[in-house]
Amino acid sequence: MTGTDDAKVLFGVKKIKEATRGNKTFVLEENLSSGGAGLFSIEIIIDSAKAVEIIKENQWKSAKSFADQCYAIRIKNRENNKTFYVLAGGGTGGMYGALDIAEAIECNSINKLLESDNSPYLTKRGIKYNIPLDLRTPTYSDPGDAHQQNIPDTWDLSFWQNYFDEMAVHRYNVMTWWSLQPFPSMVKVAEFPEVALNDVWRTKEKFDDTYSSLGLNFDRPYLFQNIEVLKKITIDEKIVFWKKVMQMAADRGIDIYLFTWNIFTYGATGKHGITRRQDNDTTIAWFRASVREMLKTYPLLRGIGITSGEGMDNKQTGEYANEKWLWKTYGEGIRDGLKNQPDRKFTLVHRFHWASLNEIQKEFKDLPCRLELSLKYAIAHMYSITNPQFILPAIPLLSPQTQSWLTIRNDDIYSFRWANNDYARSFIRNIPAIEKVAGFYMGPDGYCWGRDYLSKLNNNKTPQLIIEKQWYSFMLWGRLSYNPDLPDNTFLQHLPQHFPSINSSELIKGWSSASMIFPWITRFVWGDIDLKWFPEANLSHPNHKGFYTVKDYIERVPMQGSNIDGILVWASNKVEGTKNNLLSPLNVADTLEILSNNSLASLQKLPKPIHQSHGELNQTLSDIQAFALIGKYYAEKIRGACDLALFDKTKIESYRKNALQHLQLAKSFWNQYATIYSTKNKVALYNRVGYVDVEKLKTNVQQDIDMVVKWKPGQNQLIPNGNTEVPFKQ
């Protein structure tokens, strides 16, 4: 098929061979695959000049582009022979074209494969991965079970190989590693020799839900009193390891970026005089030297992302003000690192978080590489509405020269499998001014997108990767961000490969309905950041509200741009006989019930799920049922809150009676949901919302009913609640 030694193309060829072996219609023999329909051959060209020559020879339509990631597929038909040409200007485009052909073979649609010209809609399509390195160099999410469980996987080459393979198949081309700061686990700095860390540590002690949401005090002494050494490895061996990992990524067309929060000195505190103080010149020198060494040590590192917070002293002024500190450390460190490699392509991504554009541009004016920005696109909830409004104030100040990344946070769905083509396509299509968008990275802060240690059903086997478990949603977001015009069948054709024995049309019908339940409840409840709202458990961090009560529902202000009325305003208007053009809370409840009923109706036509079975079909059907049940819970809870609000305003007892009826129904749905959820998933500690134990939360569900029974109209202060952090400052 190809004579190239390009690793990316060879991966595409490997996937073609795997697809052919798995499809009895085709028998691959070197350059030919043969079947009942005739002979098939595949040519992959990754030289633009040669590709143009072949196009002219065959009098084909010219390819639109041979730029990076672009490719054309052309087809030559002869008697009893069809040749597919993948024509590209480089290895990534060649790989993507080969993957198209592999997919067509696997899904029995090779005879339907058409000629095409392909180029990325969004040029950078990434994963946000809070990387759990070591007890001594934590990430933002380390006080949570998933990150602690995934530390050993971080140091396993096969983990990364599988991860990058899956990313490439779904057309992701950026991996962003997020750490409070990783330097002691990744580089040696000659000026600070005591800082570099050998071995990999994990505590045997338990974290709890009392840890800071700002990344502070993750080095409590008790954690170090009982440690386990997960891997004996020197810093030099670590460097070799990370070079191999970055090469693996490059071999799948994936760029590595490293993101940090600031100022954190875990692993270095107390050595050579290093402290967290912002005015400590030794700390500044260490950061600068560490950044320099990251660039010198890892030539495949594509960029560094930085955050002005959460551990910075915003009261500092003068030479130690936040942006000046970041320039002295990261800006100067990058300048040092690029001094002897001025032609290297490198990017500094400065997050808008707690920073302003004017200050960033002022302090980083002498940066010797590309400067890009980053903005929280939907704050922490990508599964809310398809057109978040928060970027709009920034758009006039951005340009193709001053682009922003989109942080697309998924702190909505940790355990479930999600599938809704229309939502994902609309979300991507609605991104405004894409010429001003550098790309996106997608992922959670409150969960680890490594291996699935949450499931109870791993049968003592190595847990599967989250990207494998949630393959359909990862496929949607990756493929549609490369090409949002892909037809639905691109995705639907994979369902019979995963679930050969069932009605795929009925499955996706129910699955799609179920997958809209969290977007609807999240846009209504709207807790902007992750610690304020987790829809799998109607929960926020205990220091915020904990479990959302029926009173809390009355007070919620829905998401900006959702066009939904909050219950307080709706109840006042109803009592006063006035109207507005917003969707009422009862419309939201009705929508949730319809989505749930549609999901359950589809399940009636499919095999009954066995919730304790680890098989993919059973677990997918089980997820759909769980979505539907919590959707019904949310519908009845909203109705109960509406009636309680009317009772509070009117003192009419029938409203209280109605509220109680709705909340009793909500309780029954929660109990059914909790049975399924707890059958599938362990009780877990999450760094952003604390412990999630849906069985234990039955007590809180009952307390809603008790609250309504005791409610005295007019004696409860009801205050609208639902502020959103400002993701952009000029």
Stretch-by-stretch model annotation:
Residues 60-282, 299-300, 436, 441, ...:
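Feature activates predominantly on carbohydrate-active enzymes
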Residues 688-730:
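A eukaryotic intrinsically disordered, low-complexity regulatory tract that is acidic and Ser/Pro-rich
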Residues 212, 444, 448-693, 700, ...:
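C-terminal non-catalytic alpha-helical accessory regions
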